[in-house]
Amino acid sequence: GFDTNDAEEEGLRNWVRNIVNEGVTALLPTTITQSEEVLTNALKNVARVVREGYTGAEILGIHFEGPYLDMKYKGAQPEQYIRKPSVEQFKKYQEAADGLIKYITMATEADEDFALTRYCAEHGVVVSIGHSAATSQEAVQAFAHGARSMTHVYNGMTPFNHRANGLVGAAYRMKSMYGEI
């Protein structure tokens, strides 16, 4: 298989060239939570491939999944690299990616004053709530500050309950929100 975090440029080129055989015409290579060094290298690799050219499925940008996640709902994401959302750190990642981060999955309830949520929304990066312990009400607040999506609804988030609707309940209620399954 292929992992955006581990791949060298040639691996990425082979992946996008061959994935069209599976019917994929466009994609967002996705990173997962890792050390700053590993993430920076992965972002630079994708940016270099896009800049130098390739054949195959179109790379629309990068999906940056983590490291701004909730420990309880981290799933397979390595907890030693989970961080609080930081605009300054994200700017460094976006610079390494040559501006290609177009979609970010994060636990918006950990985003103090929704600073990173707002920054991303203002700079054309889709904010998606995922790997999150947010309540339904916190999701509504995140959407008021620019979040637009939920990453893999039902997985890595507060569940639906008749007394506490969680993120799953918010996904059903909010008409302007995109819920990815």
What is each model feature region?
Residues 95-181:
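Active-site core of metal-dependent hydrolases
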